[in-house]
C-alpha cells in the first residue's frame, strides 16, 4: 500500500519539485489549488502526461472549514494523508510604511494560518495510525527578516515557532 502525500502550493516552483520527488519515492501525490485557479487543468494534464498520476483538489488553505472539507475529500478519494507538506505561500513585498492591513492579512493567512488549518486536519489520523510526517516549508527570512518583507518574515518566523 503506498502512502498519500499532500502538498499545498504544489503547482509550481518548489512545490512542484516536492511533488515530483515524493512521486519518485513511491507516494500517491495530491496537491491543493486555490478555488478558481484557471491553470490547474493544464498543469495536472501536463504532469500526468509525464506519468506522475497526481491529483489536485480545491482548497482555500486560509479557511479552516475549507481545509477540513479538502482533507475529508482526499481521505475518501485517495486515502488518509500520511505526509503533509505545508508549502503554500505568497508575498506582498513593500516597505512597512506602504503596507496595508489587507497586505498584512493576505500573507499571514496564507503563509501562517494555513499551517494550523491543514495540520489540524491530519494530525489525529497520523497519531492514530502511528505514522505521519508534517513538513513546513520555511524561509531564512523568518529568522533574519528582510527589507520589504515584514509580513512574510513574521509569517515564516511564526511557522518556525509552530514547528518547534
Task: Pin down the residues of each PLM region.
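Conserved glycine-rich Rossmann-like NAD(P)H-binding loop of the short-chain dehydrogenase/reductase
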Residues: 25-41
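Active-site loop immediately N-terminal to the catalytic Tyr-X3-Lys motif
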Residues: 97, 144-150
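Active-site helix of classical SDR
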Residues: 119, 155, 163
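Conserved glycine-rich cofactor-binding loop
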Residues: 11-12
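Substrate-binding pocket helix/loop in short-chain dehydrogenase/reductase
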Residues: 95-96, 103-108
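The beta1-alpha1 cofactor-binding region of Rossmann-like NAD(H)/NADP(H)-dependent oxidoreductases
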Residues: 37-38, 58-69, 101
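Residue(s) in the substrate-gating loop at a strand-loop-helix junction
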Residues: 139
Amino acid at each position: 500500500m503506498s502512502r498519500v502525500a499532500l502538498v499545498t502550493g504544489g503547482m509550481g516552483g518548489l512545490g512542484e519539485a516536492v511533488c515530483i520527488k515524493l512521486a519518485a519515492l513511491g507516494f500517491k501525490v495530491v496537491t491543493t489549488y486555490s478555488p478558481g485557479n484557471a491553470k490547474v487543468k493544464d498543469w495536472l494534464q501536463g504532469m500526468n502526461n509525464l506519468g506522475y498520476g497526481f491529483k489536485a483538489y480545491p482548497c482555500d488553505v486560509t479557511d479552516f472549514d475549507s481545509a477540513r472539507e479538502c482533507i475529508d475529500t482526499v481521505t475518501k478519494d485517495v486515502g488518509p494523508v500520511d505526509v503533509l507538506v505545508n508549502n503554500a505561500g505568497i508575498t506582498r513585498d513593500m516597505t512597512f510604511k506602504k503596507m496595508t492591513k489587507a497586505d498584512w492579512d493576505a500573507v499571514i493567512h496564507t503563509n501562517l494560518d494555513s499551517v494550523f488549518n491543514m495540520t489540524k486536519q491530519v494530525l489525529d489520523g497520523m497519531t492514530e495510525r502511528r505514522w505521519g510526517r508534517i513538513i513546513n516549508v520555511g524561509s531564512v527570512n523568518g529568522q533574519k527578516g528582510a527589507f520589504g518583507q515584514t509580513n512574510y518574515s513574521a509569517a515564516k518566523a511564526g511557522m518556525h515557532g509552530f514547528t518547534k
